[in-house]
Amino acid sequence: KNTVDMHDFEDAKDKIYMGPERKSMVIREEERRATAYHEAGHAIVAEILPGTDPVHKVTIMPRGWALGVTWQLPEQDQTSHYKDKMLNELSILFGGRIAEEIFINRMSTGASNDFERATKMARAMVTKYGMSDALGVMVYEDENQSGFFGNVGSRTISEATQQKVDEEVRRILDEQYTVARNILENNKDIAHAMVKALMDWET
């Protein structure tokens, strides 16, 4: 091949972002279907909620460390993050696990990274960004402050206040989980159609 076309650029971009394809990996049909529902859950919630980054690609082709990927691309550079969009991003993160619960009635470990990211984001909203009405605009934790054993973070609040922080983080996560679940419960036909397409075409 003597020329480079857009397909080559797209493949290169996918490899950088998602890792190389693992075409030799043998995946059971049941697991492929579970992955398809997981990724469809992310994509449907992302498409329906307002103000989210557009879904660029959804794939169940194993790449890098993942069995599947839902890839959103912003339409413009972002220098600030806003509360409404961050809340929607939490719902998108939950979409994968909820789709597993609704459509295959099983839970996999594939959502662990989603939960970790969601928990960190919700906690930052409460403790760093002043986005909790219950706790106000005070910064409650400084994760960058060096402790006696190095950069271990610092908890500068009482146990009672920490409990309030934890309760507020839980409230935010629970509310956005409910948002995502309602979306998927009301769009089952779209989910089934998307899974069929992913099973047929992989991307």
Range-by-range predicted roles:
Residues 1-11, 15-34, 129-137:
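C-terminal helical "lid" subdomain and adjoining coupling/linker elements of P-loop NTPases
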